[in-house]
Amino acid sequence: MKELLQKKLSDSAAARWTALLAVSFTMMCGYFFTDVMSPLEPMLTSNDVNGLGWTSDEYGFFSGAYGYFNVFLLLLFFGGIILDKFGIRFTGLASTLLMFGGALIKWWAVSNTFDGSVTLPFGIGTYHTQVLWASLGFAIYGAGCEIAGITVTKIIAKWFTGHELALAMGFQVALARIGTACALALALPFAKACGGVHAAVGLGAALLCISVVAFLVYCVMDKKEDASAEAVQTEPEEGFKFSDLKMLISNRGFWYMATLCLMFYAGVFPFLKFATKLMVFKYGVDENMAGLIPAMLPFGTIFLTPLFGYVYDKFGKGATLMIIGSALLTIVHIIFVLPITSYIIAIAAMIALGVAFGLVPSAMWPSVPKIIPMKLLGSAYAMIFYIQNIGLALVPIWIGKVNQANTLANGSIDYTETMTIFAAFGAIAVIISLLLFFENKKKGYGLEEPNIQ
């Protein structure tokens, strides 16, 4: 009995998987809201009774708003420092409330009509007032969602290090992809059935309210975990110091990981935001069904990410998995560049992209704790997510302007230039993943070694 009392709560499989389920549900709701507007682009740019009359440029500006505060106000970077300094419970609760608040602003914006437009400085562009209000809400939500993301990632590392770390992270990603897939597949028909864009956004906001409650449940478990860890700890852990950030900044492996994250995700998430229209204009898919093809990507990762995570836990080869996934991403986008208009090819390419999207995250996120110590993990994930958000903020703006420039007289879009850009992101990701592979050989991070001890 004494031996049992001296175990941490996280040593119980039931306890750690229950904790994982609570925080994964929170992020699943978040990912639903993140992409709930992606399949609605045809309605957003329509001038009919349920449309909002946005331009492609305005939609690109709005899509990029997710990362504006994270990138330009450094909120994500400071969020990582707050996480390491003040802990998981404080940071997680604050970030989930920020998500809900931003979602309410966005819902209010698309539920009302606004007169006039505003010209932004530095030649950014002129946008309708409604677009700016919706973008503000999305930016606030994005700051909360990214901070919640690094918090949840550190939570998983805290509870699963020495156990099924990659499988657990894969499970969390799988639930997140369920959220994304549901948004891509259901948002457009739900909005049409319920009278407009505001209905789908309102549904997402309601789910975020429930997600706050789910995180409160986790907070109770986290407090018990800390108490059990103190009971078995033989000597106090060294706390976070600002001077420790030098160790992070000078780590070449960390920078390879961060750059890989930037390039890989720049080739996936911004692509998803424009993929519905791609299916309509290039592959001739019916507008009501077009969102289902991009939805195949997250649905595929629901099964593949935990599977590849299990492979990493059991057999290792994390760096190799990242190389294969990056190469597959590049091949898929090259296929989308080619003058092939068969929707069957589009479906096959999207399935292959789903495999790539399962390979890289399943190996990348569990590899960070092998490179960075636990006391700096929040800051490390924050910096990686911050760099990722540069892509999430700027790439949609770039792609929106490229699509606007390639809009033909009949209103259709030539996607050749757009998909060439995405293919270039994939090619750079391949190069970076190879550099990480050789850096691991040199420094002995253990990226090719199994996670289960």
Question: What do these predicted ranges mean?
Answer:
Residues 97-126, 327-341:
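C-terminal ends and interior cores of transmembrane alpha-helices
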Residues 199-217, 417-435:
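Symmetry-related core transmembrane helices of the 12-TM Major Facilitator Superfamily/SLC fold
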Residues 318-364:
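C-terminal transmembrane helical hairpin of 12-TM major facilitator-type secondary transporters
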